[in-house]
Amino acid sequence: MHLILVRHAKAAPGQPDALRPLTTSGHLKAIELGELLARKQPAAIVSSPLLRARETAAAIARVAGLEPVVDERLAPGATAEGLKKAVAGLGDTVVTVGHQPDCSEIVLALAGREVEFPTGGFAEVEL
């Protein structure tokens, strides 16, 4: 499986953590990500339940012609094992949208390499 881990785009401060929406620049970045990642023909997009991740996933999904799936296993504190269970059987290429430091820790666990994840950043891993 080709796995594309995305960190949510830039979110606005001043809200309870789970309810922080994307900023205007965050929405634009999410659309840009969608245009880039749609070329990789993902079979599914799986998101953390937090609003900023769901909004990022929705923007990517719109461009890719998909409906995002929300999975609690991608919420803050996500693990490589939980992520593997969340994407099992979803297709050859899957995009996940999550949080830091989880994204970096998952790439390290799955691929043995350290990756920086700015907001709206992504990394690709083969499972």
Predicted regions and their residues:
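A glycine-rich beta-strand to alpha-helix segment
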Residues: D92-A109
